């Protein structure tokens, strides 16, 4: 080893020792012909004193050095309480430049704001800053904590293929040409879903993997085309068994940041979550639940409220908003695909004003504040129309109100299981939300096609009412994991495919290997996958998952560091068989 001691480990008890350190010049100060250098490396920072001006003259920020010298106690009054090494310094008698540094594109400092594009282009420099550096170290601890829990429960860590066949799972695949079979293609997996089910058929019983997954999605804020999930699958289990293991993992992870997660975690049905919060991932760090006003306005003359659903959410103190701000709410709603956001203002004397107040009856006005829980000085926002989009608009408004009115307790951790989700949803709803609907019928899977229905015998009689053994874990309004009890019978899987418009021939072509496996005594099984990037971002206290990924992509999947994706040469294109046709064309996929 070049170094004999970690710089950040030096303390008063090391005074008098001769040590060799190695690291980077984080900062330099000159005083009376003496150079004081903050030497930074993974363990921390220590001050190095260089009295030889000729040696110190050429040293600049981020030079990589090896320093040999004696550990001495700092003079009284010169201690630095902000450094763990602040009682001591190293007086150098030998300095070796291991590598010089060119002028920096930005300062290596946690106190200077740098544009994300520059940070990602020079990510290797960005990671020298303590914030990004600590985030990756936290990620490593998170990995270990999860492994420790699962190892105690006799789980087996197994790697599944990253070159497989294209099997629709709800998003577009990244495709890889197979050079040895021109015209044929591998796909990078969107998840290990089918392989982990096959491992249950294989008798592994308890599997996990910190898995890389790939989805070729349209650009969405804070999404990555390649991401990581903690993937877990268990045989001979029911929903409660999976949730108990998942909660044990969460307890271990949040303990890393000093928080005790109280278990068992609360549960709420999907239907209740949508009714009360307008979303299946509610943030429970604030109140302001949605209020159903459909029955209240059942006989209203106001045509806008003559709808299948009328709902409201209250903005505390919102009546004092100027007209310009109220108009801005309309634009906010239109950006979300709505026509606007109706409102009434509850004045200090209880009188209702605003556009809606002029269109409803005196009787409706008289009891509206009480019905919605509004107080004098509040604003009541409304949405009317089909239940799902109207609730979604109010749910988004609720969160926006929480942010604008400081209603969210930023220091709190709020966990919730959302259970009993629908098995199917209208295909039009899935495509409208940006998902790739699997199948060709009016119905597609809410989670994926391998989720077990709760009513195995009767789910296909009324697909729109069928419930799934599916569960999502929500933390502070973020979905951080989701899973289900899986289908383990060939006949049930075929019936689910049929509801989705996948006939037997297509099912065999795309999923024949899974259906074949189900013929050989497949055990009941279920599992969960945690969104690892999101969890680490929450634990690190950062807004973006890009901050906890070593080399993330920017918007649209572009990598500023390597300039990927990039064109390939004509020779590469020919060799890979990109334009070749397979010997036998496959039917078009959904």
Curated annotation (Swiss-Prot):
Offer a single GO CC term for the protein: cytoplasm
Q: Name one GO biological process term.
A: aspartyl-tRNA aminoacylation
Q: Enumerate the UniProt keywords alphabetically.
A: Aminoacyl-tRNA synthetase, ATP-binding, Cytoplasm, Ligase, Nucleotide-binding, Protein biosynthesis
Q: List where in the cell it is found.
A: Cytoplasm
Catalytic reactions on record: tRNA(Asx) + L-aspartate + ATP = L-aspartyl-tRNA(Asx) + AMP + diphosphate
* Record region (Disordered): 556-590
Q: Name one GO molecular function term.
A: ATP binding
Question: What Enzyme Commission number(s) apply to this enzyme?
Answer: 6.1.1.23
Binding, L-aspartate? 169, 215, 447, 486
Question: Residues at site: Important for tRNA non-discrimination?
Answer: 31, 77
Asked whether the keyword Methyltransferase is assigned, the reply is no
Question: What residues bind ATP, as annotated?
Answer: 215-217, 224, 479, 531-534
Q: Which domain of life is it from?
A: Bacteria
- According to its UniProt record, this protein's enzyme class is ligase
Renumbered residue ranges of the record's region Aspartate: 193-196
Pfam families, sorted = GAD (PF02938), tRNA-synt_2 (PF00152), tRNA_anti-codon (PF01336)
Its family remark reads:
Belongs to the class-II aminoacyl-tRNA synthetase family. Type 1 subfamily.
* Subunit comment: Homodimer.
What does the function comment of this entry state?
Aspartyl-tRNA synthetase with relaxed tRNA specificity since it is able to aspartylate not only its cognate tRNA(Asp) but also tRNA(Asn). Reaction proceeds in two steps: L-aspartate is first activated by ATP to form Asp-AMP and then transferred to the acceptor end of tRNA(Asp/Asn).
Q: What PANTHER family does its record include?
A: ASPARTATE--TRNA LIGASE, MITOCHONDRIAL (PTHR22594:SF5), ASPARTYL/LYSYL-TRNA SYNTHETASE (PTHR22594)
Q: What is this protein called?
A: Aspartate--tRNA(Asp/Asn) ligase
Gene (name only): aspS
């Amino acid at each position: 080893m070049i170094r004999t001691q970690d710089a950040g480990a030096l303390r008063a008890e090391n005074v008098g020792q001769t040590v060799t350190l190695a690291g980077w010049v984080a900062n330099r100060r000159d005083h009376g012909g003496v150079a004081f250098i903050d030497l930074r490396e993974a363990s921390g920072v220590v001050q190095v004193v260089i009295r030889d001006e000729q040696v110190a003259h050429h040293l600049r920020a981020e030079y990589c050095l090896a320093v040999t010298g004696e550990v001495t106690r700092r003079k009284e009054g010169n201690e630095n309480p902000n450094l763990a090494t602040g009682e001591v310094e190293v007086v150098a008698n030998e300095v070796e430049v291991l590598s010089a540094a060119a002028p920096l594109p930005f300062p290596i400092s946690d106190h200077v704001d740098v544009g994300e594009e520059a940070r990602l282009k020079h990510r290797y420099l960005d990671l020298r800053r303590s914030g990004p550096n600590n985030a990756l170290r936290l990620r490593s601890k998170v990995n270990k904590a999860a492994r420790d829990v699962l190892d105690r429960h006799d789980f087996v860590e197994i790697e599944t293929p990253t070159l497989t066949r294209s099997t629709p799972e709800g998003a577009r695949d990244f495709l890889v040409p197979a050079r040895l079979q021109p015209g044929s293609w591998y796909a990078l997996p969107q998840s290990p879903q089918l392989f982990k089910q096959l491992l249950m058929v294989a008798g592994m019983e308890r599997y996990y993997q910190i898995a890389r997954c790939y989805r070729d999605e349209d650009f969405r804020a804070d999404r990555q085309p390649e991401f990581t999930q903690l993937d877990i699958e268990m045989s001979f289990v029911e929903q409660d068994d999976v949730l108990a293991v998942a909660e044990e993992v969460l307890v271990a992870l949040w303990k890393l940041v000093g928080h005790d997660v109280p278990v068992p975690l609360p549960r709420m049905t999907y239907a209740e979550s949508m009714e009360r919060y307008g979303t299946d991932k509610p943030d429970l760090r604030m109140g302001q639940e949605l209020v159903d006003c459909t029955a209240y306005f059942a006989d209203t003359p106001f045509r806008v409220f003559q709808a299948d659903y009328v709902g409201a959410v209250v903005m505390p103190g919102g009546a004092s908003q100027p007209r310009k701000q109220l108009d801005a709410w309309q634009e906010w709603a239109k950006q979300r695909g709505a026509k606007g956001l109706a409102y009434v203002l509850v004045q200090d004397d209880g009188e209702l004003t605003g556009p809606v107040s002029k269109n409803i009856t005196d009787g409706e006005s008289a009891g509206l504040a009480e019905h919605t829980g509004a107080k004098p000085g509040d604003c009541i926002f409304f949405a009317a129309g089909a239940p799902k989009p109207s609730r979604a608009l109010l749910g988004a408004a609720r969160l926006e109100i929480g942010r604008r009115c400081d209603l969210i307790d930023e220091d709190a951790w709020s966990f919730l299981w959302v259970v009993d989700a629908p098995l199917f949803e209208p295909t039009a709803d899935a495509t409208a939300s940006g998902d790739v609907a699997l199948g060709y019928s009016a119905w597609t899977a809410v989670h994926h096609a391998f989720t077990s229905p709760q009513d195995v015998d009767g789910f296909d009689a009324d697909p729109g009412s069928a419930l799934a053994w599916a569960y999502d874990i929500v933390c502070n309004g973020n979905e951080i994991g989701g899973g289900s009890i899986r289908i383990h019978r060939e006949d049930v899987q075929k019936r689910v495919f049929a509801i989705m418009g996948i006939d037997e021939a297509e099912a065999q072509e795309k999923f024949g290997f899974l259906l074949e496996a189900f013929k050989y005594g497949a055990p009941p099984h279920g599992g969960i996958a945690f969104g690892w990037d999101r969890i680490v971002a929450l634990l690190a206290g950062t807004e973006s998952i890009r901050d906890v990924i070593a080399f993330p992509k920017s918007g649209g999947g572009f990598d500023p560091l390597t300039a990927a994706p990039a064109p390939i040469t004509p020779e590469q294109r020919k060799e890979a068989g990109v334009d070749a046709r397979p010997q036998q064309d496959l039917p078009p996929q959904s």
